[in-house]
């Protein structure tokens, strides 16, 4: 029933298995690839284009459903919705890897679906999916020039060791996360994020990955041979004579149009010429009865015109050593930079390079604003977001605004990778950071303008980044063995060239690298020269940026939110929260701040200004702090009794001010001096297992400063005497006669003096003429051990 084909090999320490003939047999090609514990079903279906087109209508979809990791989708429907960003990015990786290998002129619809069936959270699914897509194309009969395989490369800087298809845990210690694809002879695509690595380290990583792809390329070739399926015959439509016809009549006109350095004017001139060529060619080949004289259709004319323009611009660059806008091959367009361009945002920058412009804006939020990502590797939180928007007006088009597409998601992710390494640690800067790049003009390299603008906007915001980051896009014109590398390419140079090579980094090294090809790959030599030329361009751009701002502002804007983190003992978390959340609600209501408490004892305080942050922080510290002898605290009188007053301090702790510690003079009634709800400043003068003894008379009630002459070295004692209310606080354990203490104490109080003798101190902890509570000197009935709570 099944005609099984199976091939396997050991690769990167795991078993790689290709199998076909059992699942999805209605597709042109279907292969189940198992690599380690990850399984992907890749299918290819081809059909005639539904309408005439002059491009390859290739669609690639990577689908990762939650059952692959044994999960049920969240949400009400319990079913997967639109593709996640990760699915979109992997789809782009596969598309960019295989698109250059289809023959020129092949315009049939091709649909590739890579369905992740099982995922072990160790083996990279993008590697498995690309292998499956290539193997499925190889046995589908669709014309396809060569085998392409992808590999994920890591780098352990401390060991100078490169890793092949490492797990997510292993990549945590890696200074590089690079995915590349290549065929037998060359590299086709690179996507990477790095920690300021040098050009030589990046080149070695690319070479390492390409070499390790060869074993799998050989396996896929053997797999195709065993299947016995060959590509169906494809003969591209010959439009050579039509191209020559256009060239003979319009070379000079197009040369003049392409020499216009103003993009808007150049585009208008080229559009007029293209309309004229189409009209002239249709009229030339049309017969009186309306039928075409030969096989040339309007689509043929459009294809021929594109071929002519590509050849014209490329030959001009190579033969005359002159680019479209007259720059040298390594020349950078004029750069204009402004920061703080929007008054009420947390940070902003306007970066203009030639006719490419990015308005980049930052917004700071709290950790509660972090994006929760439901990923196959497990839920995670992102505190750095970068969104790239490319509206139609950026290229002078009239169209409706739509949701971000694959290109916008991909460009935003590249800029995100370029910036992420230089961001501060969350413990040092706990804000959630959102960067939005609005492309307001575009003539090539808008993603790299986003990188430059994001770096500038972050510094304007006051985010303490490690170093400024700049990006540059390189191009390639290759004819035979001759090639020219172009710095800071225009949109037309990107469209008509052979390579889009983007490099971003600091003055110390590369933080992101992306390469896309329009031909069947390039050699390591070309990549090396591109990296070195890109470094010169990156340094030039960084110099321009440094003229405007070299480092982050010392503080964030006044209208930006304030965040402060403090650490408390985990055992105190319940005290801060309070019964039913009472304490935390009270803090938020009184201060206007938001408070978030982590399980490790980290407390995050968010507010609109510093005063609110300090107020909330003080309230929290009051709750978690323990009374300390000799420290002054703010308190509130909560109860008046005959022998003193009870005071709430340190976030709800209760202490007692004995009547003799209220004022430095005799008082008949506590209520005549203080009342309930009075705010007082108190000094802790004694602590034992049951009581906290406080004093008002030893503290200046205006300034909160201890009064000179009223302090002494209080130390805790272990007196077991029932005649003393306190069991700590005295510096002298001598117990003089009651008569002596009473007499000396009265004389001092009546005279208001502040000079004392050590022998006058009783071990009750109040000192300075204070008597034992049981003296009942003021006529108050005081129990030996008053109830305290």
UniProtKB/Swiss-Prot annotation:
Keywords: Cytoplasm, Magnesium, Metal-binding, Nucleotidyltransferase, RNA-binding, Transferase
InterPro entries: ExoRNase_PH_dom1, ExoRNase_PH_dom2, ExoRNase_PH_dom2_sf, KH_dom, KH_dom_type_1, KH_dom_type_1_sf, NA-bd_OB-fold, PNPase
Known EC number: 2.7.7.8
Molecular function (Gene Ontology), one example: RNA binding
KH domain mapped to chain residues: 561-620
Segments of skewed composition (Low complexity): 763-780
Cofactor(s) the protein needs: Mg(2+)
One family name in Pfam for this protein: RNase_PH_C
Localization of this protein: Cytoplasm
Region (Disordered) residue spans: 709-789
Reaction catalysed by this enzyme: RNA(n+1) + phosphate = RNA(n) + a ribonucleoside 5'-diphosphate
Record-level GO cellular component terms: cytosol
Positions bound to Mg(2+): 494, 500
Cross-referenced Gene3D superfamilies: GHMP Kinase, N-terminal domain, K Homology domain, type 1, Nucleic acid-binding proteins
PANTHER family: POLYRIBONUCLEOTIDE NUCLEOTIDYLTRANSFERASE, POLYRIBONUCLEOTIDE NUCLEOTIDYLTRANSFERASE 1, MITOCHONDRIAL
Record function comment: Involved in mRNA degradation. Catalyzes the phosphorolysis of single-stranded polyribonucleotides processively in the 3'- to 5'-direction.
Similarity annotation: Belongs to the polyribonucleotide nucleotidyltransferase family.
Protein name: Polyribonucleotide nucleotidyltransferase
